[in-house]
């Protein structure tokens, strides 16, 4: 009798544990690629296909779009964005052939070439864009998409946008709008805030209509996605969207302080914690971390750190600074965080050449007056209100292009 009761208790415990694990399971989001594959013939049969993709163009099982479509469907050209088709290039991307299929590759990350031209598109009936974006204006993949949309319009080609989650849409819309003198730059193209909190498909629809590109585009939607999700809540397999975005904390760090990268500092590239380690040989890490912690930024803490990058800024030199640690990502105030980190870094930059160095971040941040006010330690209420009004105006327009709750 005792043994039977023990079995019942153990069985009950196992059932409760299993039920709990089911209730705690991550939601399963299906990407545009996953959904395209269910009905690919309708879109692709008998057509010559040009792919604009990188290594992130994978299905729920981690299989790459090139390997999924070739040779059943006729891929005539592959267009490579920054970092290349297989995502192993950190700087210059060249024309060539795909290492696996030997299909021709045209680089869209060259000094004089950022979009397909008429000759590239002669043997293409339909373009497919499938690249994982992270949701900040100064990430170049969205510009590659815009320029491809313009090329598609100019050459009478249809373009499919295979939607993917915004990796950090949960941080919301924030940051200054890109001022007019920076419009059309490759790292920041259109006047939107630093973070748009849209999927790449939503952004494509917004750009196409609001900026009157007028391309023939179709978004293959996600299913199961909500804007409040971080990427690691979608159930989709992880692929570094670029070589130095290696986990969710680096995505968040890039959102919060990636715009400061052009300063004379290391942002952790060439370390195991890119966009989580920030420093330079001339910083006092303890003072910098203490000042940031004193600001009591919600959802974050800062620890003094010394690190030696193996590449990029200050390669093989000891850098002193701080490690950004996320303690509660739901509590983060991105705009306040950017202002505080920028202000404290400015205080610690060497006086010689500081202002010239400081002005270099204006393009990424998007607003020269805002950058200047941080340097002066000002808390200009007028400027803050203007940015808030601009963000609200963008958010109001953005609303009609959202495809998901």
Regions found by a protein language model. Give the residues of each.
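Bacterial N-terminal signal peptides
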Residues: 8-17
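Short internal beta-strands
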Residues: 76-83, 162
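Glycine-rich, charge-decorated loop segments at or immediately adjacent to ligand/cofactor-binding or catalytic sites
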Residues: 87-92, 160-183
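Glycine-rich oxoanion-binding loops at beta->alpha junctions
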Residues: 94-124, 136
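Glycine/threonine-rich flexible loop motifs
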Residues: 133-145
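Conserved anion/nucleotide-ligand pocket segment
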Residues: 183-254
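Glycine-rich, aromatic-lined ligand/substrate-binding cores of catalytic
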Residues: 225-305
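Conserved functional hotspot residues or short segments at active or partner-binding sites
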Residues: 279-386
């Amino acid at each position: 009798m005792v043994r039977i009761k023990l079995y019942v208790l153990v069985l009950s415990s196992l059932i409760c544990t299993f039920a709990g694990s089911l209730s705690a399971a991550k939601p399963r989001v299906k990407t545009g690629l996953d959904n395209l594959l269910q009905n690919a013939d309708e879109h692709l049969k008998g057509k010559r296909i040009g792919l604009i993709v990188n290594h992130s163009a994978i299905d729920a099982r981690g299989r790459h779009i090139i390997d999924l479509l070739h040779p059943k469907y006729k891929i005539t050209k592959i267009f490579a964005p920054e970092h290349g088709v297989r995502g192993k290039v950190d700087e210059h991307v060249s024309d060539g052939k795909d290492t696996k299929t030997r299909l021709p590759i045209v680089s869209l990350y060259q000094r004089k070439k950022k979009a397909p031209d008429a000759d590239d598109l002669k043997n293409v009936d339909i373009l497919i864009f499938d690249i994982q974006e992270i949701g900040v204006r100064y990430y170049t993949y969205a510009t590659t998409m815009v320029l491809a949309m313009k090329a598609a319009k100019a050459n009478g080609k249809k373009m499919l946008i295979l939607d993917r989650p915004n990796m950090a849409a949960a941080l919301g819309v924030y940051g200054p709008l890109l001022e007019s003198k920076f419009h059309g730059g490759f790292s920041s193209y259109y006047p939107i805030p630093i973070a748009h909190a849209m999927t790449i498909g939503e952004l494509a629809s917004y750009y196409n209509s609001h900026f009157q590109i007028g391309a023939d585009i179709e978004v293959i939607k996600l299913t199961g996605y909500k804007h409040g999700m971080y990427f690691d809540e979608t159930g989709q397999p992880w692929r570094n969207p670029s070589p130095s975005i290696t986990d969710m904390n680096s995505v968040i760090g890039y959102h919060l302080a990636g715009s400061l990268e052009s300063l004379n500092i290391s942002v952790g590239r060439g370390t195991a914690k890119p966009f989580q380690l920030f420093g330079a040989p001339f910083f006092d890490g303890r003072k910098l971390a203490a000042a940031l912690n004193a600001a009591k930024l919600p959802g974050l803490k800062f620890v003094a750190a010394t690190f030696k990058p193996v590449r990029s800024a200050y390669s093989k030199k000891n850098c002193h600074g701080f490690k950004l640690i996320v303690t509660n990502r739901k509590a983060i105030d991105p705009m306040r965080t950017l202002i505080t980190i920028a202000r404290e870094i400015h205080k610690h930059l060497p006086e010689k050449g500081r202002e010239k160095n400081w002005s270099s971040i204006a393009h990424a941040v998007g607003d020269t007056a805002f950058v200047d006010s941080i340097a002066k330690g000002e808390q200009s209420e007028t400027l803050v209100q203007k940015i808030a009004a601009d963000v609200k105006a963008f958010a109001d327009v953005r609303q009609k292009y959202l495809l998901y709750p």
